[in-house]
């Protein structure tokens, strides 16, 4: 009878200790996966920001060049002001 009681106590002790360690292992694995996912998202965001910045810089340069050429061609093709 005592052996059955000790067996039940030992089984209960084992059952309470192991699920806690399994949960801790799962949590640590999930947290490492979360940090990897966060890192990938950060790198992706930086990449898209760099692409946007590069394209925006090209657009600004193109607009500045168009404005400069328009000012040069406009001064060249406009008729001289009438003399009075």
From Swiss-Prot:
For this UniProt record, the keywords arranged alphabetically read as follows: Cleavage on pair of basic residues, G-protein coupled receptor impairing toxin, Hypotensive agent, Secreted, Signal, Toxin
Q: Which GO terms describe its biological process?
A: regulation of blood pressure
Q: Does the keyword Secreted apply?
A: yes
GO cellular component terms attached to this protein's record: extracellular region
Species of provenance? Heloderma suspectum (Gila monster)
Signal sequence region = 1-23
Q: What does this protein do?
A: Has vasoactive intestinal peptide(VIP)/secretin-like biological activity. Interacts with rat and human VIP receptors 1 (VIPR1) and 2 (VIPR2), with the highest affinity for the human VIPR2. Induces hypotension that is mediated by relaxation of cardiac smooth muscle. This vasodilation may not be transduced by VIP or PACAP receptors.
Q: Give the propeptide positions.
A: 24-44
Report where it is expressed, by tissue.
Expressed by the venom gland. Not expressed in the pancreas, liver, stomach, small intestine, lung, heart, kidney, spleen, ovary, and brain.
| PTM notes | An amidated Pro-81 is described. Such an amidation is however not compatible with the sequence displayed. Indeed cDNAs do not encode a Gly that could serve as substrate for peptide alpha-amidation.
| Pfam families attached to this UniProt entry | Hormone_2
Where it sits in the cell: the answer is: Secreted
Task: Report the principal subcellular site.
Answer: secreted
Q: Which PROSITE patterns match?
A: GLUCAGON
Q: Does the keyword Disulfide bond apply?
A: no
Its protein name is: Exendin-2-long
